[in-house]
Amino acid sequence: MNAPDKFAQLLALTREPFPASTKNYLIGSRPDVRVPVRDIALTNGEQVSVYDTSGPYTDPAAEIDVRRGLPSVRGAWIEGRGDTERYEGRQRVALDDGSKSEDAARLAQLRAEAAALQRAPLRAKSGASHTGNVTQMHYAKKGIVTPEMEYVALRENGRREWMAQYQQDAAREQRLAGNPMGASIPKIITPEFVRDEVARGRAIIPANINHPEVEPMAIGRTFKVKINANIGNSAVTSSIEEEVEKLVWAIRWGADNVMDLSTGKNIHTTRDWIVRNSPVPIGTVPIYQALEKVGGIAEDLTWEIFRDTLVEQAEQGVDYFTIHAGVRLAFIHLTAQRRTGIVSRGGSIMAKWCMAHHRESFLYEHFEDICDIMKQYDVSFSLGDGLRPGCASDANDEAQFAELRTLGELTRTAWKHDVQTMIEGPGHVPMHMIQANMTEQLRTCHEAPFYTLGPLTIDIAPGYDHIASAIGAAMIGWMGTAMLCYVTPKEHLGLPDRDDVKQGIIAYKIAAHAADVAKGHPGARARDDALSQARFDFRWQDQFNLGLDPETAQQYHDETLPKDSAKVAHFCSMCGPKFCSMKITQEVREFAAQGMQEKAREFRGTGGELYVPIQPA
């Protein structure tokens, strides 16, 4: 079976809309600003609207051919600004797909299958009348509100009308008000607010001009907490088809961003398929591909090879690069006494290069050159934490914080070039040390968005690290982290498959939502209230459909009560019909109401007098 047929087979599994859900769009000030929402119809006639990351894949009206890529969302906006130009781009070479790529015939076949995914790249115009800079931060600093910023504002607000009935009790709202931990979160996100946050560097909108298919989103602590899912092949396993399916599967369950961390065969061609078919921003770690180009020998890396890789990926449309420029020669000795040393792949690659040449990292030395590339395409920095702790006992040590201080310095440099920047964080941190991480990051990195891997709070949960890390993720998300990188059950054990991806995303959607509720993000709790009401009313189907994973919720319910009659029963298999606390509560309320009615009848029977003479015994 050829690759396109395989793609069609796989993607057919993920195009079904969610139960009782309809894809709708909020329209902005121009007709091509169309922001997706998922409307959930409840059995009592109400409708709940939720943030949607699934792109056109869950829209039955959308025609999708993964061999050609998704339709453009931003093409007209980019062209309308008049500050970009198409050009031929760099010439592809066999080494772009890695030194271990398929044989020449198979590679030619793979590239032929991806022919319709190729685009002539765009870059910023330069010269007397142009700045050579097309970043959202550049526009924001000039006071320009772009369509991308308006799109973000509409997306963050979503539909609010349905929430009103759950927010009418002022005393309850006051009692449940969140603590934003110093963030200034407005009740309504306006396009001007988005512009201001981007201009200040407190938020980014990752959106390469060569990724017009992306639906703009914001990463910043005044916005909803976002989650990132990692996909990508390895030298051991996986195929292009599987990775594209993981992408579509990940965004179905709520991934706001996806990183392609491929380190195996066909890296460039795999990325063609992923970027062209992704409605969410795509990130990469360019040093991985650069290392493949030198046969996996870190000391053979050069600035020239790395620079060429940056341009290659920017032309393809990658939205953000993880760059481990904070791993400096002077910091490497600080990891010598660690229990697990350097656990970042990119960090270890650069540490080995620095030691082999006994000189400063070429990423650090050429950082301004990197900025010059980024601003031509609007690629955002994700400044990598190459010295992050790999176990709880290494948390918050000098190596970690020395690198963090350097990332703060590099953030200032990036902002000088108007390059959007976020900061990567740990890792493995016990619960009582998480606040110190957030405080230090805000202080040293000037409130640039923080993007953390968890952190894992304990180290004894192989197979369950998605839970161990979601605990830390919820905490640090509340404290100010803007994006959480998911962890799957396979963390530390192997390459995640489709089911692992789903489990990791659901765990992190829970963490992100818990953080939004704790921060008091406007409307965050309304979906919880709607589900709680459905639970109290024994509207089982609504309970399933309002959850993060309707399929699993219904599956668990139906394992013991599979009949349709159980969907209207006022009990579940946990308590049965006699011991359901909610059913008993409803009965108590009914008894109380009946008692009040009886007393009212008794009052009227006495003539409606407030004071009735006591009859002698």
UniProtKB/Swiss-Prot annotation:
A Pfam entry, by short name: ThiC-associated
E.C. numbers: 4.1.99.17
Residues engaged in binding [4Fe-4S] cluster: 572, 575, 580
Entry annotated with the keyword Plastid: no
GO cellular component: cytosol
Alphabetical UniProt keywords: 4Fe-4S, Iron, Iron-sulfur, Lyase, Metal-binding, S-adenosyl-L-methionine, Thiamine biosynthesis, Zinc
Recorded catalytic activity of this chain's protein: 5-amino-1-(5-phospho-beta-D-ribosyl)imidazole + S-adenosyl-L-methionine = 4-amino-2-methyl-5-(phosphooxymethyl)pyrimidine + CO + 5'-deoxyadenosine + formate + L-methionine + 3 H(+)
Cofactor annotation comment: Binds 1 [4Fe-4S] cluster per subunit. The cluster is coordinated with 3 cysteines and an exchangeable S-adenosyl-L-methionine.
UniProt GO molecular function: 4 iron, 4 sulfur cluster binding; carbon-carbon lyase activity; zinc ion binding
GO biological processes: thiamine biosynthetic process; thiamine diphosphate biosynthetic process
Keyword Kinase appears in the UniProt entry: no
Biochemical pathway: Cofactor biosynthesis; thiamine diphosphate biosynthesis
Positions of substrate binding: 230, 259, 288, 324, 344-346, 385-388, 424, 451
Residues engaged in binding Zn(2+): 428, 492
Domain of life: Bacteria
Cofactors demanded by this protein: [4Fe-4S] cluster
Annotated InterPro entries: ThiC (IPR037509), ThiC-associated_dom (IPR025747), ThiC/Bza_core_dom (IPR038521), ThiC/BzaA/B (IPR002817)
Family the entry assigns: Belongs to the ThiC family.
Assembly: Homodimer.
Job description of the protein: Catalyzes the synthesis of the hydroxymethylpyrimidine phosphate (HMP-P) moiety of thiamine from aminoimidazole ribotide (AIR) in a radical S-adenosyl-L-methionine (SAM)-dependent reaction.
Entry protein name: Phosphomethylpyrimidine synthase
Name of encoding gene: thiC
